[in-house]
């Protein structure tokens, strides 16, 4: 498998997935796994694995009892008594048969129902309860249906035109290597958010009742009363006190120029198929763990499923000139391509990387993430000439779109620079018309206001708010009060930042 080859490349031993032998906790409780780059360590790691496996085998029955608790012990005792009364020899593991009743179809079904309800998918929960997998005689089914119907009566429809949209860039793991006293370091300090800041933002927004939705949950193109196709608002129903919001992350490409800057350098899949990040520390040691938005958000939603509406996660905005997600997949890295750039370091594994990225984007889609174009070369679409914009987006369609699991209909403008003003797009707008011809229907610019959403024709436009160093500092150090509806910036701002924070 490709992932196995990648692991061998770094001299790793064993699997990494969830809470296994190689997991290490940091002070913030984030899960990490250190990858030993020195071959001499591998022998000791192997010995450690063998010892732990022997201990784990000996303690298996004990752990099963802990996990199943009194119900299993009771079931085992009942099974033993039944065997004794019938004259049968008692099973060495009498709870083996009884455990089937503990995890029967109805139990599994109710767990799925609870998950759907926790993420506000009440219709899905009712469908599950009405399906063939339920034991209709089980009183829990009727009770659960009654509970769901009672909750549905209290739901409040969200006004899609008052839904805020926040965004981030690649998160900073080591500010000491990122926020240097250089032009680039000052730029990072302005536009980037640290890992502790992001974690605090998630926690505070959750505590304030915010619920993460996808941009496609806001509206979709459908026929109106006259048979015309129009972008029409959808219903988002949430309990009282809950507030919908959208999240996105720009430049999820892990550019070459960011190498060694204290940030993650790629996304990959662990042995359970879950997205994690690769990070190299100052000593050159490679770590796998929660070093950027995706795995941190995944863990937060796993712990707080009611933070996500029907499993929605963030929009990942991709350019193309350095490849995507940390892999140099663009044709400019391909010596066999007529568009190969000799100034680029060629990627001899480009086809393998492209195949792996397709696998990765499919996994991210199934995990609730959406993808957006951020142009190919991070161009200012609001300012450049039409022909230059066409050439740029055509390169994105050629090099990035084929790596995605579905057609991309979201455009997140670089620099927040829209191709139109505040008035609705019209067919006279040639830039919009060309983007629309490629299938783009959702367009995002940047604005510091709490919300701005516009629909018309076959488009939805939404402004985004930057929760970066500059915006945090303007509230924290200058009293701007632009973020108080979301967070308490005094408890979010990372004191490791150099101040004041200027605009890049």
Question: Where are the regions a protein language model picked out?
Answer:
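Short loop/turn hinge sites at secondary-structure boundaries
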Residues: 87, 120, 224-225
């Amino acid at each position: 498998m490709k992932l196995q080859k990648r692991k061998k490349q770094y001299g790793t031993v064993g699997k990494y997935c969830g809470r296994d032998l190689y997991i290490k906790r940091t002070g913030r409780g984030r899960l990490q796994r250190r990858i030993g780059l020195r071959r001499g360590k591998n022998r000791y790691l192997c010995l450690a694995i063998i010892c732990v496996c022997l201990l784990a085998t000996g303690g298996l029955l004990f752990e099963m009892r802990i996990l199943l608790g009194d119900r299993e012990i009771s079931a085992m005792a009942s099974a033993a008594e039944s065997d004794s009364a019938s004259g049968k020899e008692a099973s060495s593991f009498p709870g083996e048969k009884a455990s089937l009743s503990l995890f029967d179809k109805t139990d599994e079904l109710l767990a799925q129902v609870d998950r759907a309800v926790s993420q506000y998918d009440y219709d899905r929960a009712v469908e599950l309860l009405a399906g063939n997998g339920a034991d209709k005689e089980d009183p829990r089914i009727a009770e659960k249906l009654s509970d769901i119907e009672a909750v549905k009566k209290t739901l409040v429809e969200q006004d899609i035109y008052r839904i805020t949209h926040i965004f981030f860039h690649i998160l900073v793991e080591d500010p000491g290597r990122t926020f240097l006293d250089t032009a680039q370091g000052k730029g990072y300090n302005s536009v980037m958010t640290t890992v502790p800041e992001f974690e605090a933002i998630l926690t505070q927004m959750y505590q304030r009742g915010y619920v993460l939705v996808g941009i496609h949950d806001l509206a979709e193109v459908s026929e109106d009363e006259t048979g015309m196709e129009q972008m029409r608002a959808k219903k988002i129903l949430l309990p009282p006190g809950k507030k919908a919001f959208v999240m996105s992350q720009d430049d999820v490409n892990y550019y070459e120029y960011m190498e060694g800057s204290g940030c993650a350098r790629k996304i990959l899949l662990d042995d359970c198929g879950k997205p994690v990040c690769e990070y190299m520390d100052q000593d050159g040691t490679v770590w796998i763990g929660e070093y950027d938005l995706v795995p941190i958000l995944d863990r937060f939603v796993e712990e707080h499923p009611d933070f996500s509406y029907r499993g929605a996660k963030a929009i990942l905005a991709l350019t193309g000139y350095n490849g995507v997600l940390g892999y140099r997949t663009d044709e400019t890295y391909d010596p066999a391509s007529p568009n190969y750039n000799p100034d680029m370091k060629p990627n001899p594994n480009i086809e393998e990387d492209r195949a792996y990225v397709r696998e990765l984007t499919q996994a991210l889609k199934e995990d609730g993430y959406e993808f957006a174009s951020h142009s190919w070369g991070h161009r200012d679409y609001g300012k450049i000439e039409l022909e230059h914009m066409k050439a740029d987006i055509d390169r994105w369609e050629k090099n990035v779109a084929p790596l995605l699991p579905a057609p991309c209909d979201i455009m997140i403008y670089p620099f927040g620079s829209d191709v139109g003003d505040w008035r609705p797009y019209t067919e006279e707008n040639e830039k919009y018309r060309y983007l629309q011809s490629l299938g783009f229907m959702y367009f995002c610019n940047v604005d510091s206001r709490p919300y701005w959403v516009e629909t018309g024709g076959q488009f939805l436009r939404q402004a985004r708010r930057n929760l970066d160093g500059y915006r945090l500092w303007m509230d924290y150090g200058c009293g701007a009060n632009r973020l108080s509806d979301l967070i308490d910036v005094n408890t979010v701002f990372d004191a490791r930042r150099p101040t004041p924070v200027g605009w890049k």
